[in-house]
């Protein structure tokens, strides 16, 4: 008998045109769901209504099914305020304050293929100065990762690009002491950024949200 796992893993690693089309459609549905949740949050808070994390999760689920997705690709994460600092937060019960940042990590599954989107937004529709500074740093790091993602690039290239931007940004914002860390390279070598960014950047995606790779 031959173990087919290795063969199947190799088949799943490279997607054909049909698979890519399904993945793009799943991503489009998920993007609509994120926008719906953001809009509902700001509108409800401005109207003086209570908003809880599970209310935003319900908006996500509504949009997934509305556009034909069979299910969430994984348990959705909706984390308001300090809850967003908890990796893989699952409670989804806390109230959302108008001055909170809200992190949503959610994606749908469409015809067997997963999507995965994480976004952070100001619950009431406007950033404070400190929130905007952090958001723009993360956005710049994301743009660096996207620019580093290309055919023939090393798998680690997007992560390395992200960390380089974050390391310099943490120094510039004063979140890391320049007297202790003389340069962004020093921050990277000593992994001083790890307190704020302990994840990797990106993962394989396909029939599973963390697909074979």
Language-model-derived ranges and their functions:
Residues 1-213:
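Active-site neighborhoods and metal-handling regions in enzymes and metal-associated proteins
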